[in-house]
Amino acid sequence: MILDKVNSPEDLKRLSLEELLLLAEEIRSEIIRVTAQNGGHLASSLGAVELVLALHRVFDSPRDRILFDVGHQAYAHKLVTGRKDRFHTLRKEGGISGFTKVSESPHDAITAGHASTSLANALGMVLARDLMGEDYHVVAVIGDGALTGGMALAALNKIGELQKRMLIVLNDNEMSISENVGALNKYFKELQIRKWVQDAEKLGKNILERISPQLFGLVDRAKEAAKLLLHQENPFYAWGIRYVGPVDGHDLKGLVHILEHLKALDGPTLLHVVTKKGKGYKVAEADPIYWHGPPGFDPKKPEKVSKGYTWSQAFGDAVTELAHMEPRLFVLTPAMREGSGLVRYSLEHPERYLDVGICEDVAVTTAAGLALRGMKPIVAIYSTFLQRAYDQVIHDVAIENLPVVFAIDRAGIVGADGATHHGVFDIAYLRTVPNLQIAAPKDALELRAMLKKALEVGGPVAIRYPRDNVERAPEGVWPEIAWGKWEVLKEGTEAYILAFGKTLKYALEAAGDDPRVGVVNARFLKPLDREMLRALSRYKLLTVEDHQRMGGFGSAVLEALNEMGLKPEVQVLGLPDRFFEHGAIPSLHRQAGIDAEGIRKALAAMGVAVVHERA
């Protein structure tokens, strides 16, 4: 195999074009093989193989810096930069990351995971290069979905102003995770149509020259005028950025030729490359949304694998039903329709649904505008992505106490996506915001109750739930919930475990049938149930959460006890002050000491060693 001979990008420069083409197919096979075992971002990486090979053939990594936005498309990059022998560990605990990571390889120019960051990073690098008198190329590879992000567009504005030498490669596959939205996406499609027209014109060029040179000259002058008009329309020219394309992102020879030419140019240049997401794997080409990030599968008989009924689906079903009951309900998502469980909702209530693209800040402030005019918006968003709209939560929603509901998916440890995606900071950054209330349901039925009640409380509410399966709640059932009140699930005589969110199942498992240990579903963090907390203060208390210990639920409990002048023995379990890498969720919980075993150890340290009765 040719891949066996490739240990660094330098090895690509010694291969013939024919060998590079064979290598592309070998890389696709390896990507399919490993993602079939481990899961991962399959379709994006399959679509970028030729582009990655061309970039590493032309440029000199790691001296030249090649940045991959998000990192979904970087598997081929990992395979040709000395990590092929570890590629089988992709996304596994102790293995290589599913994204680019500076600490993993000198060829990874940035640590990625969130969208739209590559252009600002690249701008910083070219500024440093020029100030330090160095000479190397900086290439930022960004998808058409990530380019819709406000951070990317703002960076383009500055890149055009400063006119520094750099190359932007727009990898246009018409997708982010869901289908792309917005005016810029429509423009890219129009450019592709124009490219098709230009190709058709080539067919008639020689015919016109033979029939009438005069007629050909007239047509040629008209085309030059049209080109000038096109340049005036092109938004990249308006930014002061040279635009080249669109070109075929699977034409390896053509890509190498174009990149060699662009390498010699001064100033900022954008190369528009059109690729097919899932290229070379028929099922992924046909359904790039599902095969964007599938779980494990049989590569010989690839079929969609049921992930069971998830919290995301429970949320989607609940809001779809709620929208039939509440005509002012409106749901927004930042490019995560499928991931947030909103396919059904978007089909049944298209007029009250908005995908703003990869623009979390826009989602939150648009929700504020809706609320100001009497609507009841729900922002469906992952915990890790809500970080990107923190100012909007405060400035546009909370200050005016607007009735916006934040449905925070993927709260807590999320597993194989690792440090950039764990939702373990939202409690700390949200509970300090005045007016904003925070809750976490124990099951799908309680989620329905919280969503319905949240639309009635009159201010901002955050409801957080994990990446996990959950038992389906019956449709049409909307139980009442005592807002701000906790729930005792098991009485105890010596100690109580106060569990917030997902850790409740661990608390019940740890307590077992020991009569000394009680368990509380501490489902409301803000407001805390101070009445129950006061009543429980005569017992030993252990708080548990799937969140950073610092600033989390346990901290809130300690603050409340201090304010009430109560001093029970309290231990706080949560994530320590470090970033957790990728791995299986149960294993990462075990590392953090927040699983059932960790809870039992903490109880034992408090003098309450749990004893289970034998049947």
UniProtKB/Swiss-Prot annotation:
Pfam families for the chain: DXP_synthase_N, Transket_pyr, Transketolase_C
An example Gene Ontology biological process: 1-deoxy-D-xylulose 5-phosphate biosynthetic process
Top-level class of the enzyme under EC nomenclature: transferase
Pathway(s) this gene product operates in, as recorded in its UniProt entry: Metabolic intermediate biosynthesis; 1-deoxy-D-xylulose 5-phosphate biosynthesis; 1-deoxy-D-xylulose 5-phosphate from D-glyceraldehyde 3-phosphate and pyruvate: step 1/1
Required cofactor(s): Mg(2+); thiamine diphosphate
Binding sites annotated in the UniProt record for Mg(2+): D144, N173
Positions that bind thiamine diphosphate: H72, G113, H114, A115, G145, A146, N173, Y281, E360
GO cellular component terms listed in the entry, alphabetical order: cytosol
GO molecular function: 1-deoxy-D-xylulose-5-phosphate synthase activity; magnesium ion binding; thiamine pyrophosphate binding
Keyword Disulfide bond among record annotations: no
Reactions catalysed, as given in the entry: D-glyceraldehyde 3-phosphate + pyruvate + H(+) = 1-deoxy-D-xylulose 5-phosphate + CO2
SMART domains in the record: Transket_pyr
Cofactor note: Binds 1 Mg(2+) ion per subunit.
EC number: 2.2.1.7
Keyword vocabulary terms for this entry: Isoprene biosynthesis, Magnesium, Metal-binding, Thiamine biosynthesis, Thiamine pyrophosphate, Transferase
PANTHER family the UniProt entry points to: 1-D-DEOXYXYLULOSE 5-PHOSPHATE SYNTHASE-RELATED, 1-DEOXY-D-XYLULOSE-5-PHOSPHATE SYNTHASE, CHLOROPLASTIC
Subunit and partners: Homodimer.
Family under the similarity heading: Belongs to the transketolase family. DXPS subfamily.
Function: Catalyzes the acyloin condensation reaction between C atoms 2 and 3 of pyruvate and glyceraldehyde 3-phosphate to yield 1-deoxy-D-xylulose-5-phosphate (DXP).
NCBIfam families in the record: dxs, PRK05444.2-2
Protein name: 1-deoxy-D-xylulose-5-phosphate synthase
Record organism: Thermus thermophilus (strain ATCC BAA-163 / DSM 7039 / HB27)
